[in-house]
């Protein structure tokens, strides 16, 4: 594969060294576990967390005479992912044997795809920002290829003081290896790319993206160079299992390589691992090249072939993807690019928002989901799937505000009650006497009392009418936040002789 440099050097991406600026070049190889009930070449279950060696067929264990049979659903999932990446779908692809020895690889080789992958070149667009002016920077990252392959088993070294064990539950599970082009120039870009890729496969339903369970992990290729020069020698950091760790690994590895080069040394092409505890990478082994694996077509598998109709049938059923959904939220619902970007970042968040916004003001719904719901989820370490406030409950709170049954301040208190205790918002308001005070007589008395008690403040307002907000706040405080804010403001202005602008 010939690497092509498509990025113009950008000074704001450079990292400073003792002898001048350096540029990082990053490419990612992401292994995404295919969402399917059975493995790539056997009928064994793919359920995560089962007892060791309980999801193993004779094919997975490489028993003599056992032949692989392709799982059609895994093929469909790979094609769906390729379509979601705007990539070329190859109607003919070939499975190869990648030969290497490892205890948890019972066949002595991995069935993968080398020269003829199922998916060719594609693109992902990421957005970085916003900057101080509120602008976003869109960057297009190239996809080199996507191919199907088997996962290996798992070596277990913590079960016995003197022995290691092998769990083959993962052996033969279908993986999509999604290989980017070396188009990223900072850790933020790499994190943005991985975040966007995870979002896309989750929208498509082709991978759950749960990095903590190992169903998505990244091999990170990092090199450094002087701006404008050719590619440097790269090192590959294997099996990084969180987006945050990807960023940390890149930052450390780039600094390590710069220090070596500035000291007059050379970078060895090698495979490294990232130690999250120490925040550093360390050497594992010298980096293999393709010829070291002695690829050749698997004689037990015919070439994988399908026609255009097969692809089109999958294409028509694709869901709306993040970029299209964001564009619709901006164009049809009038949301800002910033708000739309947050809401489409995860399919579950977008689905939640659309349920809340149905039949309601889109911007009001967005404000509540982003500021109140997501803020609370972040504060208490929860995610959208485990939120204690359902879309119906949040929608009910918004309805009560619109009907002027409660004020904005009371709505915040109501949200907290629903979060902690659950329940129907309207019934809670009724039972706890939280309804907004709309009786103008009662509000007028409260305004009169505040004005009478603060003659000095009245004089200040006459000199500076914008200070009238102080009186509004005092009245709201005196009424426990139950007074209608608009009615309070109108009465305060009338009593103080302030004309509307």
Curated annotation (Swiss-Prot):
Molecular-function annotations in GO: asparaginyl-tRNA synthase (glutamine-hydrolyzing) activity; ATP binding; glutaminyl-tRNA synthase (glutamine-hydrolyzing) activity
Name of the featured protein: Aspartyl/glutamyl-tRNA(Asn/Gln) amidotransferase subunit B
Matches recorded under PANTHER family: GLUTAMYL-TRNA GLN AMIDOTRANSFERASE SUBUNIT B MITOCHONDRIAL AND PROKARYOTIC PET112-RELATED, GLUTAMYL-TRNA(GLN) AMIDOTRANSFERASE SUBUNIT B, MITOCHONDRIAL
Keyword field contains Nucleotide-binding: yes
Similarity section: Belongs to the GatB/GatE family. GatB subfamily.
Pfam families associated with the record: GatB_N (PF02934), GatB_Yqey (PF02637)
Function: Allows the formation of correctly charged Asn-tRNA(Asn) or Gln-tRNA(Gln) through the transamidation of misacylated Asp-tRNA(Asn) or Glu-tRNA(Gln) in organisms which lack either or both of asparaginyl-tRNA or glutaminyl-tRNA synthetases. The reaction takes place in the presence of glutamine and ATP through an activated phospho-Asp-tRNA(Asn) or phospho-Glu-tRNA(Gln).
Organism per entry: Agrobacterium fabrum (strain C58 / ATCC 33970) (Agrobacterium tumefaciens (strain C58))
Gene: gatB
Major enzyme class: ligase
UniProt subunit comment: Heterotrimer of A, B and C subunits.
Family matches, as SUPFAM superfamilies: GatB/YqeY motif, Glutamine synthetase/guanido kinase
Entry superkingdom: Bacteria
EC number, as in UniProt: 6.3.5.-
GO BP terms: glutaminyl-tRNAGln biosynthesis via transamidation; translation
Keyword ATP-binding: yes
InterPro entries in UniProt: Asn/Gln-tRNA_amidoTrfase_suB/E (IPR017959), Asn/Gln-tRNA_Trfase_suB/E_cat (IPR006075), Asn/Gln_amidotransferase (IPR018027), Asn/Gln_tRNA_amidoTrase-B-like (IPR003789), GatB (IPR004413), GatB_C_1 (IPR042114), GatB_Yqey_C_2 (IPR023168), Gln-tRNA_amidoTrfase_suB_CS (IPR017958)
Keyword terms: ATP-binding, Ligase, Nucleotide-binding, Protein biosynthesis
Catalyzed reactions per annotation: L-glutamyl-tRNA(Gln) + L-glutamine + ATP + H2O = L-glutaminyl-tRNA(Gln) + L-glutamate + ADP + phosphate + H(+); L-aspartyl-tRNA(Asn) + L-glutamine + ATP + H2O = L-asparaginyl-tRNA(Asn) + L-glutamate + ADP + phosphate + 2 H(+)
